[in-house]
């Protein structure tokens, strides 16, 4: 296992649309493992592959209920609205209020290549949307109503 360096705002890869994963190879499995190690090392709740310099549609999340691994995630349903503060491992020291859907349903592949549906609300819904935005080259500061130093 390895801890990746988290790339910060200003890095080109954070503004690119990430490439879909065509095949789940041992390298993708290793990426998932190392991303989870990196997430836990950084005390984060979510991490997208572009944040570690890899332009792939891969996300890992753990909001305290165990790890969730998502390959090629797509939001298929949204409900309600929630305004709350967000931060980002790629934008240290900054928080901002961002409006997000209160509930989401996401389809993605797991590391076995099986299609899974994840339903989330609260922090999980916010984290799913935030990380999927990373795959589109969108950062939370692009959507924030206001930002502040923490």
UniProtKB/Swiss-Prot annotation:
Chain residues that bind Fe cation: 88, 130, 134
BP GO annotations: co-translational protein modification; translation
EC number(s) on file: 3.5.1.88
Residues annotated as the enzyme's active site: 131
Keywords associated with the record: Hydrolase, Iron, Metal-binding, Protein biosynthesis
Catalytic activity: N-terminal N-formyl-L-methionyl-[peptide] + H2O = N-terminal L-methionyl-[peptide] + formate
Cofactors: Fe(2+)
Signal peptide: none
One Pfam short name: Pep_deformylase
CC cofactor note: Binds 1 Fe(2+) ion.
Top EC class for this record: hydrolase
Gene Ontology MF: a single term: peptide deformylase activity
NCBIfam families: pept_deformyl (TIGR00079), PRK00150.1-3 (NF001159)
PANTHER family listed in its UniProt record: PEPTIDE DEFORMYLASE
Role, per record: Removes the formyl group from the N-terminal Met of newly synthesized proteins. Requires at least a dipeptide for an efficient rate of reaction. N-terminal L-methionine is a prerequisite for activity but the enzyme has broad specificity at other positions.
Similarity comment: family membership: Belongs to the polypeptide deformylase family.
Name by which UniProt lists this protein: Peptide deformylase
Organism expressing this protein natively: Desulfitobacterium hafniense (strain Y51)
